[in-house]
Amino acid sequence: MNEKKPYTISETSDGLTSITMAGLTELFKTRGTALSFALALADRVSDRRTGIFHLQDTPDGKLQMIMHKTGNVITFKDYDQAAKLADMLVKDLLP
């Protein structure tokens, strides 16, 4: 039985890679850029090189991921939940 993924990955008609999670969509110029994002999240660090997002802890102990381009905020219950999502994204984005 396959686990339902908490995101969808698709390609737009103009060639961008779209990742939708928690009802929010982020567009990446290439699948490689999306993979870079997923790998950075998997490592639980901000991707300073591309400036795609940063992570911050909330006062109630949760983890927020703030996307720099759109300002979208995705809240995870903890680092483990974020890491699990990232691992799933990496597997789906690898060629």
Language-model features: locations:
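Positively charged, low-complexity terminal tracts
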Residues: 1-95
